[in-house]
């Protein structure tokens, strides 16, 4: 049975993550406040960031950038900006 949480990103009740995906205090916050749906949206943005900016997840500076962008996206309401990308019209 899945857990239900209040997702602070989506501003609604939603299925929570099955387990903590990120280490430390930030990981606990993500586990408690971010839904599967919101995490999936972040994963898509993260993939775009890695590909477009040619980031290497083995590089500590690149990992730090990804973490900063993740916090901005999930908790501060900022969208990920990628040069030259225009989101599709809804």
Swiss-Prot record:
GO terms for cellular component: cytosol. Pfam families: Iron_traffic. The keyword Cell inner membrane does not apply. GO terms for molecular function: iron ion binding. Keywords: Iron. The keyword Protein transport does not apply. InterPro entries: Fe_traffick_prot_YggX, Fe_traffick_prot_YggX_sf. One of its GO terms (biological process) is cellular response to oxidative stress. Monomer. Could be a mediator in iron transactions between iron acquisition and iron-requiring processes, such as synthesis and/or repair of Fe-S clusters in biosynthetic enzymes. Belongs to the Fe(2+)-trafficking protein family. This is Probable Fe(2+)-trafficking protein.
């Amino acid at each position: 049975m899945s857990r239900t949480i209040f997702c602070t990103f989506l501003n609604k009740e939603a299925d929570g993550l099955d387990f903590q995906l990120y280490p430390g205090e930030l990981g606990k916050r993500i586990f408690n406040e971010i839904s599967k749906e919101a995490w999936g949206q972040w994963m898509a943005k993260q993939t775009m960031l890695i590909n477009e900016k040619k980031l290497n997840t083995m590089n500590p500076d690149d990992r730090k950038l990804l973490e900063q962008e993740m916090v901005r996206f999930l908790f501060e309401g900022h969208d990920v900006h990628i040069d030259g990308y225009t989101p599709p019209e809804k």
